Amino acid sequence: MGALTKADLAEHLHAELGFSKREAKSMVEAFFEEIRSCLRENEQVKLSGFGNFDLRDKRERPGRNPKTGEEIPISARRVVTFRPGQKLKARVEDFDESKVVH
C-alpha cells in the first residue's frame, strides 16, 4: 500500500473533475498553503467530516542521548497535531480488507 501524494490529489482532480493539470496542481497547493497559513496565525483548522489540525505547545523536558546515555534537555517547541473526526474514524473502523484491489 503506497502513500497518497499531492501529485496524486492533483491527478484525481484532473481525471474526475476535468480541471487542467496546471489548475489541479494549483488548487492542491493553494489548499495546503491555506492550512499552513492558518496554523502560522495560530488558528485551528477544522475540516468537517475529516478532522482538526491544532497547535500544541510542549514544555522543555529531559531527554537522553540513546548512544551515550547522557541526559540532554529537549527544548520547548510548538507542534501540529491532528485529531480525526468521528466520520473519518468510523470509515477507517469499517474498513473491509477483502474489498481492496491488490
From Swiss-Prot:
Query: Which residue ranges traverse the bilayer?
Result: none
**Which cysteines share a disulfide bond?**
none
The domain of life for this entry's organism is Bacteria
InterPro entries listed in its UniProt record: Hist_DNA-bd, Histone-like_DNA-bd_CS, IHF-like_DNA-bd_dom_sf, IHF_alpha
Q: Which is one Gene Ontology cellular component term of this protein?
A: cytosol
- Keywords noted in UniProt: DNA recombination, DNA-binding, Transcription, Transcription regulation, Translation regulation
- What SUPFAM superfamilies does this protein map onto? IHF-like DNA-binding proteins
In the record, biological process GO terms are:
DNA recombination; positive regulation of metabolic process; regulation of DNA-templated transcription; regulation of translation
Q: What does this protein do?
A: This protein is one of the two subunits of integration host factor, a specific DNA-binding protein that functions in genetic recombination as well as in transcriptional and translational control.
Record-stated family: Belongs to the bacterial histone-like protein family.
- What do we know about how this protein assembles, alone or with others? Heterodimer of an alpha and a beta chain.
Q: What is this protein called?
A: Integration host factor subunit alpha
